[in-house]
């Protein structure tokens, strides 16, 4: 007889589950049973041979089990630790300039348009739909300096069921495109309004994040006040650091009294255990030590680092310093909205560093898979809630079908010997796309295919 106090189960799946742990970068669990409670949490993950025991404990019948096809598998939802939702309007174009010129010619004019709420709604709706469809269950979004349209992004994200951090961009310095900046007072006041109004909505999985654009667009006064807001409200923080050489030099010239780029953020209370900094290509060992001491994270954005000719992040060096790290698409400096692309580019960048004898080894695909899932969750301070299929975590997952209609993957006899092989998983990570992502779950709720309400 089953225990009466057990909560009802929303899902029971039987099949293959692929995830990471801190001791194993890719664990393939074949013929397992996974149960999801009505609250969206994983309550068991055990070998299918334990079905009778689990059925007694959790009060389910064999007919309630959904059996995956032998070629299908579940993997954790992908975590995009750095994406500019507002730049989605020109993603896939305009990447012919280095960072600072790119910001002036393309990015600031594009973001300036988001004072138009109708335009913002169209772009934000499309980017949330597109990223969810491509398996991004958690996204860390930059919006723009416009509070109302940034609040709209949070609302849209919640409506679609995506887990997210949403940041209203703060910048009170911008001589290259002066139409797109705030006064210091406006930026502080509007950030406080943004945070307050977002928190009043009580979204279950969408949170505000304090977002100074980067040191070149923020005065010391603004950075200090944003650091205080984050500290007082116990909020996450996101920004950019050491993306390209010209930027690093410009920061040195703008803030000559600081020891280095990292200290600019650190001395203004912006480098905490809730901070995620994008790029970090030129961080010194000394700076990485500070990241480790503060518990701050790095978002590795290989596509944009290559597309804007910014540099290479040495992930192995970051890991050697025990700094938390995840992957980011960095739309639109990165032209792809797909985290699968981020996985592939991260492997390639690591291979380039090996070829150039910077490192003695390269990251494996399995290690990068972990960065895109468990690593990303840790970088955003969510590894106690999501990132893999450990019991007690929320079920953020994507169902992969390598044999989907019009699949970009060709499978052969050797790919299957009764159960799914690791070759099939690798083929999906290297060759797959949204056609292979049949279903997406966030917090136990199926969000793709989309419901008629969105």
UniProtKB/Swiss-Prot annotation:
CDD domains named in the record: GDEase
Comment on bound cofactor: Binds 1 zinc ion per subunit.
The UniProt record lists the keyword Hydrolase: yes
A cellular component term, taken from the record's GO annotations: cytosol
Gene3D superfamilies referenced in this protein's UniProt entry, alphabetically: Metal-dependent hydrolases (3.20.20.140), Urease, subunit C, domain 1 (2.30.40.10)
Swiss-Prot/TrEMBL keywords: Hydrolase, Metal-binding, Phosphoprotein, Zinc
Official protein name in the record: Guanine deaminase
